Amino acid sequence: MKAYENGGHAYHATMPTDALVRFRDIMFETKSYGFEAVKAQQWDLGNRARKLIEGMGFKSVASEGFKAPGVVVSYTQDSDIQNGKKFLAEGMQIAAGVPLQVNEGADFKTFRIGLFGLDKLQNIDATLDRLKGVFSKVA
């Protein structure tokens, strides 16, 4: 605190102003596009992406009634799908699943696909085409 009061500061304590400004700008963009439109498109994308992924043989972790529109978490037995290596080779970044922490065994593997961004919502068909192309190579 004394360093701050004396005009010094720690780098790690500075506000992430660039990220906050970008977030604000995106929120204004979303507002002008329409929150209800974005909500409807997010559900459409989420439902269609999950159907596509399940159609490729990857069962959803979420039960009916609990499937989120912005993320799909699926089971896999392939470590290179779970850790993202196969997706990365195709130019797609994923997250390595969700540790449920309910005594799942060492063989428990999931992967997570985030469906975030106005760019994805504003052209759902193109988003799904890219997703299908990647899944056809990694599955």
Predicted regions and their residues:
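Conserved C-terminal alpha-helix-loop-beta "cap" of PLP-dependent enzymes
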Residues: 54, 58-114, 118-126
